[in-house]
Regions:
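A short helix->beta-strand "capping" segment at the edge of beta-propeller domains
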Residues: 13-25, 199-202
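Buried hydrophobic core positions in alpha-solenoid tandem helical repeats
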Residues: 21-22, 60, 112, 116, ...
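Helix-turn-helix repeat elements of alpha-solenoid scaffolds
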Residues: 14-19, 192-195, 327
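An alpha-helical repeat/solenoid feature that recognizes helix-turn-helix modules
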Residues: 1-12, 28-55, 72-98, 118-187, ...
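Edge strands and adjacent loops of beta-rich recognition modules
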Residues: 187-201
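Nucleic acid-processing catalytic cores of prokaryotic defense/repair systems
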Residues: 65-70
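A short, surface-exposed, charged and often Trp/Pro-enriched helix-loop connector in the C-terminal portion
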Residues: 107-108, 473, 520
Length: 523
């Protein structure tokens, strides 16, 4: 089947595609996530005894960029490049039999080292706001420098300007003391070094994960891995590596996160589909008094909680959003307790949750009106001069902008109208010649976000023309299984089903809105 045939099939029945997508969530309950260079590199170093070791090494070799680095452009490439380079140096030091020649390994590691040396010695390095980056970078630089010292190389890597090893040392001492640590730190337990091995502060979940992270799980299992094949954590890791034939994602499971986002994208767009009753029951049951985590091993967070609540309200089974009060601060809502920084997309999703519940339960609307007003004001203050928003949980401003704009469009009232209009203008001004949108290059995911904003909040001829061009682009790239990872974790990742739902929503909106979008036969 040609790409055009696929496009026509997808466009002809977004409802059927949405139904298949929702049913697929039941068959893969841990979630569907792209493999991670960072996490895969950590398993190469920490768990060479694990199934798929050779496949992981070869995958790292195959995904190295021509400039010697790994990962996305700009500062996003530092963490994956450090992890992959250190992993290859570990393989060389141990002399692992991976099926990859020693010369190939040496050349790839040397290219990685040259890029890292240039990158870290320069003054223009700007690092993104990624979880635990202030701990991960020093831990990897220290490991690489140990390799260099063993090989008699006298020029160690330096830390980025403004970054110190002191926070890492403090966390390692904290873990070693066996005192209770914040649950969110377990997601990056591998940075604790030897103290992670069997750390008493970590608790194995029912499905055998530590912190919903393969790297954290392998670091905690440590030297028991080879000798205890039946250990729950070993079993969990074996199950994960089979997903991609060796490489692993940065976070798994993401059960509640994935279901909340998929269902909300589809329902908000008005796509007809049925949700398995047990999925709705599971989603409702996951939300406790303190909210819900994205998946087992993670702390509750306002983002997952609010999107799950919003999806439930859209689907006709609303649940009071009172668990979100646990995340309220004097000015806004935090992602989790003790968060450093803030997130506009999280606050936009909290606005969605409160606003939609108030809409379907008008008798209770007064209870949430003050919070809705506070959220509106906070989001309006953080809009950039060009009309967009940016965020700490996604590399693309199109994700942040569609999250904020749609929440304000639906629940922000008259005071939010100018801001939404400015966002529409920014989207119109940043469309590429081929009809796509994207931070670095046009992508189906980012085009879907831009298209949704135009179709929900726009209306004049310029909007209709841009929407038609964006729709045509989506049809040309209908096979959306591939695409760059843009979501923030320790490394960038791509939640496949979530992105697929966003694209389906945009396609359905383009077909169903009376905005002059051309028929498929004319595209």
């Amino acid at each position: 089947m040609s790409a055009n045939d696929i496009a026509l099939k997808v466009a002809a029945d977004a409802g059927r595609a949405a139904q298949e997508l929702v049913l697929g969530l039941m068959s893969m309950p841990w979630g569907q996530v792209s493999p991670s260079v960072y996490e895969t590199g950590r398993l190469v170093t920490l768990a060479p005894w694990l199934t798929g070791h050779g496949e992981r090494v070869r995958w790292l070799i195959d995904t190295q960029r021509s400039d010697g680095g790994w990962g996305a452009p700009e500062g996003y490439g530092l963490v994956p490049s450090l992890s992959a380079t250190e992993a290859l140096l570990s393989v060389l030091r141990r002399g692992d039999d991976t099926g990859v020649g020693a010369e190939t390994l040496r050349e790839a590691a040397a290219r990685g080292l040259r890029l890292l040396s240039r990158c870290l010695s320069g003054a223009g390095l700007s690092l993104p706001d990624m979880p635990a980056i202030e701990l991960i970078v020093p831990s990897l630089v220290m490991l690489i420098n140990e390799h260099l010292e063993e090989n008699g190389m006298s020029v160690p890597l330096t830390l980025p300007v403004g970054m110190s090893a002191a926070p890492l040392e403090a966390v390692r001492a904290w873990v070693a003391s066996e005192a209770e640590i914040p649950q969110k730190l377990l997601h990056a337990l591998e940075i604790a070094g030897d103290a992670a091995n069997g750390a008493a502060v970590a608790h194995v979940t029912d499905i055998g994960t530590i912190g919903a992270s393969p790297a954290a799980s392998a670091a905690w299992l440590g030297d028991r891995g080879p000798s205890e094949p039946g250990h729950p954590v070993r079993w969990h890791l074996e199950a994960i590596v089979r997903r991609h034939g060796g490489p692993v994602p940065v976070g798994l499971p993401i059960t509640v996160f994935e279901r909340g986002w998929v269902l909300s994208w589809l329902a908000r767009a008005g796509i007809p589909f049925e949700v398995p009753p047990e999925m709705l029951a599971d989603l409702r049951a996951a939300i406790g008094p303190a909210g819900t985590p994205a998946g087992a091993g993670l702390p509750p967070d306002a983002d997952t909680t609010s999107v799950a609540l919003y999806a439930l309200a859209l689907l006709g089974v609303p649940r009071r959003p009172d668990s979100l009060w646990a995340f309220e601060t004097p000015t806004h809502f935090c992602t989790w307790q003790g968060e450093e920084g803030s997130s506009v997309s999280v606050n936009a999703h909290v606005l969605d949750a409160f606003g939609q519940y108030a809409a379907v339960r008008p008798a209770e609307a007064a209870r949430y009106a003050p919070a809705i007003g506070k959220l509106r004001g906070w989001l309006l203050e953080r809009q950039r001069e060009d009309g967009s928003w940016d965020d700490r949980w996604h590399a693309s401003p199109y994700y942040a902008t569609v999250s904020c704009s749609l929440a304000l469009h639906e629940f922000g009232g008259p005071a939010a109208v100018p801001a939404v209009r400015a966002a529409v203008e920014w989207v119109l001004d940043t469309q590429s010649e081929d009809g796509s949108w994207g931070r670095w290059t046009g992508t189906a995911e980012e085009t879907a976000y831009a298209l949704q904003l135009l179709l929900f909040a726009g209306g004049e001829e310029r909007v209709r023309d841009a929407a038609a061009r964006g729709y045509a682009y989506l049809l040309r790239v209908a096979d959306v299984a591939e695409g760059p990872p843009l979501w923030h974790d320790k490394d960038l990742y791509r939640p496949l089903a979530v992105v697929r739902a966003a694209v389906l929503a945009a396609i359905h909106l383009a077909q169903s809105r009376s905005l002059g979008v051309r028929p498929i036969s004319q595209v």
